[in-house]
Regions:
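Hydrophobic anchor at the start of a short beta-strand
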Residues: 7, 28-31, 303, 341, ...
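Conserved flavin/dinucleotide-binding core of flavoenzymes
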Residues: 374-516
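Mid-domain catalytic core of redox enzymes
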Residues: 272-394, 514
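General small-molecule cofactor/ligand-binding pocket signal
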Residues: 125-127, 267-269, 439-441, 472
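Helical element adjacent to the flavin cofactor pocket in flavoenzyme catalytic cores
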Residues: 231-296
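Rossmann-like flavin
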Residues: 134, 138-229
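N-terminal glycine-rich phosphate/pyrophosphate-binding loop and immediately adjacent elements
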Residues: 3-161
């Protein structure tokens, strides 16, 4: 490792590796990525089951090591059956691939992830769903959503109004949708409908994309842009618009990005915490790292920070930022939490239902907000091994749950257990042999599973710091004009960062107009 670089990037997640790979490959810059953990990937942590537990990036993990990897991405196990020691000892995870929290890429092989990987010559197949179904909790009926068909779980009036509003969303341009960036989707809904059925269904639909249960906390522009670009991309939830990854899981995205980065001369330091960004005369000029031999300074012309906003003040002293910005980050920004369930099954139970086995399944309002939750609790669930058979061993199947709660709710054990219990009861009502078909279950929570979000009315911190020269940000929580969420948002943020840091218009170079 040298003493000076063109660019130092803090964090080896998807955003940091994207910025590094493209600066190295296209701009021939000397770039160093520094990662405090012992592995690349950030929140893309993925596991492949073996005869004695799981492996992560080829390394077999003990239970404490598995829990440490989870902890590195703010995730922890809340329920396992049988318990983790028995799961490990019996080799129940052998042949399964899963993540530290449910992952999917929006638009699959046409998404931003695919665009960047293809740009770098590192294509990855991301097969996705084929179909979308809604399950009515009042009578447990399953409804395959058909293009142009009536929404039979809604009243005739609500179905008609819902379709009218969906047409309005999908006919917007990105510029028109951007007018709603600073209001909540709850406000947008209240301004467009007085029908509670319509409100609840569209709120649940939005939760698929935004992983937020309360529309009043959801930026309207982010969701409306998802809807606005569907026709240009030629994909939607009905035809298939989400991608999954086979072994070794979504961490393979990071592996491919890191490969492109290293092939272009980039360097990665693992297991090395950055303790401070060096700032002189309000200019970032390098970083201080902690090595086994003590602190060390590394100079850089530019610094890119991918640490989430709520953690930056550990390496960027507050004194360099306006007090309002510091207060907002500390007190008003919040974490979109994710409760994830992974279930190993003996048979393909979804074939019992009259829906496409590769459908995304939406269960709206399983628990009402009036029962003590910040928003209605909706369930997104699917058989991921039907999307990609390699996610489960031959003859077995992997069922996944994604449930949105806030960061504070994730730390309320009573609420988390209530949601898991209700989800389990729902499955038993719909599949009487649910327990007999199940070989194992694993539930995890993360209080930052879908990133850090600003309060309604505020934009995310932009990719170029306005107060410290030569300091840039990237990651799913950055970019005043990036939109979307999760991995695709991290990639968008990275491309926007490259627009400011590099010498080219990378947004136009890499992304189709509908992704900008």
């Amino acid at each position: 490792v040298a003493e000076k670089y063109d660019v130092v990037i803090i964090g080896a997640g998807a955003a940091g590796l994207t910025v590094g790979a493209i600066l190295s490959a296209r701009e021939q810059k000397k770039v160093l990525v520094i990662e405090k953990e012992e592995a690349i990937g950030g929140r893309l942590a993925s596991f492949v089951g073996g005869k004695k537990g799981v492996s992560f990036l080829g390394k077999e993990l003990t239970i404490p090591e598995y829990e440490k990897v989870l902890g590195s991405v703010n995730t922890w196990v809340v329920r396992a059956s049988p318990d983790l020691p028995a799961i490990w000892e019996q080799g129940l995870l052998d042949g399964y691939t899963f993540e530290a929290g449910v992952h999917a890429t929006f638009w699959g092989d046409k998404g931003r992830v695919a665009c960047v990987l293809d740009y770098l010559g590192k294509h990855s197949d991301l097969p996705g769903n084929e179909g979308f179904a809604v399950i009515d909790t009042r009578d447990n009926k399953w409804y395959q959503v058909q293009r142009g068909g009536k929404y039979d779980w809604l009243s005739d009036e609500a179905s008609l109004e819902t379709k009218t509003l969906l047409r309005e969303m999908t006919s917007m341009s990105l510029e028109e949708a951007a007018r709603y960036d600073l209001i909540s989707f709850g406000q947008w809904l209240n301004e467009h409908t007085k029908n509670r059925e319509v409100y609840e269904y569209l709120a649940a639909l939005a939760s698929i994309h935004m992983v937020m249960g309360e529309p009043d906390m959801m930026p309207a522009g982010d969701f409306l842009k998802f809807m606005a670009v569907a026709s240009d991309i030629g994909m939607n939830l009905i035809t298939g618009s989400t991608g999954t990854a086979g072994p070794p899981g979504f961490v393979d995205v990071a592996v491919k990005l890191a490969g492109a980065f290293r092939e272009s001369g980039g360097e990665i330091m693992l297991g090395t915490p950055v303790t401070e960004v060096m700032i002189a005369d309000q200019k970032a000029c390098g970083v201080i790292i902690q090595t086994k031999d003590g602190p060390r300074q590394i100079e850089a012309r530019d610094v890119v920070c991918t640490v989430p906003p709520n953690h930056i003040f550990g390496i960027l002293p507050e004194k360099h930022f306006p007090s309002e910005f510091v207060t907002d980050i500390k007190e008003r920004f919040w974490g979109a939490g994710m409760l994830s369930g992974y279930i190993g099954l003996k048979r393909n139970i979804i074939e019992d239902k009259a829906v496409n086995p590769r459908s995304w399944l939406l269960v709206p309002s399983l628990i009402k907000a009036s029962e003590g939750f910040i928003g209605d609790v909706d369930i997104i669930t699917f058989m991921s091994s039907n999307f990609n058979p390699l996610r489960a061993p031959e003859g077995k199947h992997l069922w996944e749950f994604s449930i949105a709660l806030t960061d504070k709710e994730m730390h309320d054990t009573g609420k988390v257990n209530r949601v898991v219990d209700e989800a389990t009861a729902f499955m038993q009502r719909n599949f009487p042999a649910w327990r007999d078909d199940m070989e194992w279950e694993l539930w995890t929570t993360s209080d930052e599973g879908y990133g850090i979000w600003p309060p309604i009315g505020k934009r995310r911190p932009d990719v170029k710091c306005p107060w410290i020269e030569d300091l840039y940000f990237a990651g799913d929580s950055y970019g005043a004009h990036r939109w979307g969420g999760g991995l695709d948002a991290a990639i968008h943020s990275a491309v926007l960062c490259l627009d400011r840091l590099g010498s080219m218009d990378y947004s136009t170079e890499i992304l189709p107009a509908y992704h900008r």
